[in-house]
Amino acid sequence: MTMDDLDLRLLDGFQRDLPLETRPFAAIANRLNTSEAEVIARLARLRDEGLIARIGATCRPNTAGASTLAALRVPVRRIDKVAALVGAEPGVNHSYLREGSDWNLWFVATAPDAEALEESLVRIETATGLVPLSLPLVRAFNIDLGFPLIGPRRAMALDRPTDLDVLRPRDKALMQALTTGLALVPRPFVALGQALGRSEAEVISRIRALAAARILTRVGVIVRHRALGWCENAMVVWRLPEPAVEAAGTALAAVPGVTLCYQRRTVPGLWNWPLFCMIHARSRAEAMEVLVQARALPELQGVPHRILFSTRCFRQRGAVIAEVAA
């Protein structure tokens, strides 16, 4: 799979800030000095080749739905079986085997609400015979995951406050549809509106409102980073006291190469690492270079940490937000 300059500019420039207008692909074409038909054709090809997952949105955790990062301690001989059982749970949208901890199978569980999320974890426990470690999000410092394809690494934008008052009852179905993806047609918001029983204008208006409120953290091209060469994924966890987390997280999120950064709940006796960051890189050496920069931060000098590289990916897809996907 080879990409030319136009492919690279398309993927690099529109992982966020998809033009929210009636003909978004025409607007992209104008910026890239090409045609609407060419943009649509290229996106379709890149999707079919497995380089992009969808044109859609990512949603802030625990706004319209509920989610948690969870882990299991799985004996090596049971990895494949347990991973299959975890992956069979509808709300599991990411699942990785990681080295560097006894907690070796990590997954993100999502559900329409907290009660449904708890029921999902109970089903996983029953199916596997293993008790999940659940680490809900406490605070986000950067969750705007993107992958620069042109030029040097750059720091991700720091997170901004969320306005939950913007949410409306029918937004869940819209957000679920956006995690599935837009149709690659000249007027995709017409097609989306027809599926939801809403007008094109209303769909665009609600997406704009949800994006401005940071409930939708990104609207654009959702790439498959492994297929694009970002094959190393390091989850680095840091142990530091609660009063120090905010300053450390803010500084860590600003390091170029740190792709996600957030605080999660600790569990006494089981997990005492509250600060997490993700480093996606093209090689382990590249990931370790980013970690060297992170460890040099005044806020993190001497702070104990662990590096959990992923060794296998079992599942990666959009979140479950609504009871029935739109």
From Swiss-Prot:
Organism (species): Paracoccus pantotrophus
Identify the pathway. Answer: Porphyrin-containing compound metabolism
Q: Which residues form the signal peptide?
A: none
> What's a single GO MF annotation on this record?
lyase activity
| Pfam short name (any one) | NirdL-like_HTH
| EC code(s) of this entry | 4.1.1.111
Keywords on this record? Answer: Lyase
Q: What is this protein called?
A: Siroheme decarboxylase NirDL subunit
What protein family is recorded? Belongs to the Ahb/Nir family.
Assembly, per entry: Forms a complex composed of NirDL, NirG and NirH. All proteins are required for the total conversion of siroheme to didecarboxysiroheme.
Entry-linked SUPFAM superfamilies: Winged helix' DNA-binding domain (SSF46785)
- PANTHER family named among the record's database cross-references: SIROHEME DECARBOXYLASE NIRL SUBUNIT, TRANSCRIPTIONAL REGULATOR, ASNC FAMILY
Q: What does this protein do?
A: Involved in heme d1 biosynthesis. Catalyzes the decarboxylation of siroheme into didecarboxysiroheme. Siroheme is probably decarboxylated to monodecarboxysiroheme, which is in turn decarboxylated to didecarboxysiroheme.
Question: Any keyword Transferase?
Answer: no
